[in-house]
């Protein structure tokens, strides 16, 4: 279920203050643990370091990202590939 339009997008207060302090197209990277914050048009052109549980992943915000959450661009799980099929290799 999506968030009500009446409520508006959720942005952590401490993150909103950092974004307003930086200004548009700032080169400084904003470090955050707030994966749940929605990306608004104010974020365009800014760089964030979003924590994925182990390290900070750099995220540069573009127009296409508006409306999504910061956490969507910082994957938390590492995919190492599926196990090889040993039966098909043994027949060759």
UniProtKB/Swiss-Prot annotation:
The keyword Magnesium does not apply. HAMAP family: Ribosomal_uS19 (MF_00531). It comes from Pelobacter propionicus (strain DSM 2379 / NBRC 103807 / OttBd1). One of its GO terms (cellular component) is cytoplasm. This is Small ribosomal subunit protein uS19. PROSITE patterns: RIBOSOMAL_S19. Protein S19 forms a complex with S13 that binds strongly to the 16S ribosomal RNA. It comes from the Bacteria. One of its GO terms (molecular function) is structural constituent of ribosome. GO terms for biological process: ribosomal small subunit assembly; translation. Belongs to the universal ribosomal protein uS19 family. Keywords: Ribonucleoprotein, Ribosomal protein, RNA-binding, rRNA-binding. Gene3D superfamilies: 30s Ribosomal Protein S19, Chain A.
